[in-house]
Amino acid sequence: GLVDDDELKAALSVMGQATYNQEFECSFIGNVKGSIYGELISKLEDEKRIARVPHDPSYPVNTAWDLGYNDSTAILFYQNVGHAINIIDSYENNNKAFPHYAQILKEKDYTYNEHIGPHDLDQTDFATGRTRREVAYQLGLRFKIAPKLSIEDGIHAVKMLLPRCYIDVDNCKKFINALRHFHRMYKEKDRMYYSKPNHDWSSHMNDALRTLATGLENEKFENVKVRQQQYMSLIHI
């Protein structure tokens, strides 16, 4: 039967907003307890930023990566359009070597500008004696390395970035679901959430997004440094 307003208010005060949304508002975000980006994703949906975001050939495409050795590698394809970050495409696979991903990039037929990779690209592969960055270079992929930050700092960078994003609803289905699902586990015994996010199928796409967010933050910092150096050199002329 119908639930009256007083019962709904009482339920909200007992359950908390997320569980209430799940029970009474059919909220998809509400299904994930401890959701890290849930509220931000809801806001993106409300603002129609998760929609058709077609590739604009007049802008180059950039990529941000999470690289796994034996598990998944995830790639986000995005375009910087003014202040906005248009995430137009995504790809994930597992147990594939670098040539596979280089081929995927070729097949997509985008004009690429830069590729941002995680810091572990510089680790040496004992089987080949080369770093994965060197292997990528030989395949025509020149990577910039995102700074090594704590997971929490990376999550903070993502939270700063998401309000600037538009995400393609067709090409980024798994990425969107991963954003919704990404969460911290609840410790019943201590009645609190673990500080680290739960590692599961949603981790790889979210790690690629962290690479993107921290890479862009670093770029901003580098640009400020360059401007400061230029300013100082003018002063000393």
Show where each model-derived region lies.
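Mg2+-dependent endonuclease catalytic cores in nucleic-acid-processing enzymes, primarily RNase H-like
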Residues: 76-200, 219-226, 230-233
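Conserved small/polar residues in nucleotide/adenosyl-binding loops
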Residues: 235-237
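Anionic group-transfer/hydrolysis microenvironments
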Residues: 68, 91, 209
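Short, conserved catalytic/metal-binding motifs centered on acidic residues
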Residues: 24, 66, 75, 179, ...
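Gly/Thr-rich phosphate-binding beta-strand-loop-beta motif of the actin/hexokinase/Hsp70
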Residues: 56-80
